[in-house]
Each structure stands twice: as C-alpha cells, then as structure tokens.
Amino acid sequence: MPATEPEQLHGLFEQAFNAGDVEALMALYEPDAALVPQPGALAEGTAAIRASLRWFLDRRGKITLETKLVVRVGDLAFLTNRWSLTGGTMPDGSPAELGANTAEVARLQTDGTWLYVIDNAWGDQAAP
C-alpha cells in the first residue's frame, strides 16, 4: 500500500521492516534516494539502500517509529521520527538496542504517492 500522505511513510516502514520485507521497504524510496545508515555514512541509490536496510533486517529485531514532525511545502515534506530497534542481535552476538531521531525528506510523486528522497536515520547524531 503506497503512502498517499507523507506521514504514512513511517507506519509503512515499520510494517514492512517488522515483516522482514526488504522489497516493501525499497518501494518507499525514490530510485536515486539517499539513506544515512549510520552516522557519517551515505548509501545512495537502490542497491546501496537495499544493502543497508538488509543489514538492519538481519538483526532480526522489531522496530518502532514514533512520528514527531511533518512539515509539508508543495511537493516536498520534511519528517522526523524517533525509532528504536529492540530484540535483535548484533553481528558480535550482543543485543541489538539501537535508536535515534531521524531527519527525512519525502517528495510527492506524479501518481499522488509519497516516497523518501533523503532518509537520515541518525539525524540527531554527528559523524564520529
């Protein structure tokens, strides 16, 4: 189900992530979108975003997103949410307890749906 309002992106992301559905996650991004998968890193384009999202999915945790802000101006929207990933396992075997406040930009498509253009999953954290 596509997002017909920008604020729907968070719920759709949470649903697809918790279902382990990388293709449903990818359907939320423009082909040339960018994702910040960790502070100081940038994944640009479909292949890089898919690989980054797969890393998070491989943690096998559950994610929750709480929308904090949506500012819509014309065909652009700025969004923020607080996300947390719990119940999974990091590659070293330690518990996966991750979370941050995001900074995201979405764009209205010609078909009336909204897709991510920029998804900074670590919007409130500086690069190391």
Which positions does each model-derived feature cover?
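A beta-strand edge to alpha-helix "cap/lid" segment located at domain peripheries
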Residues: 1-24, 34-128
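Short glycine-dipeptide loop
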Residues: 31
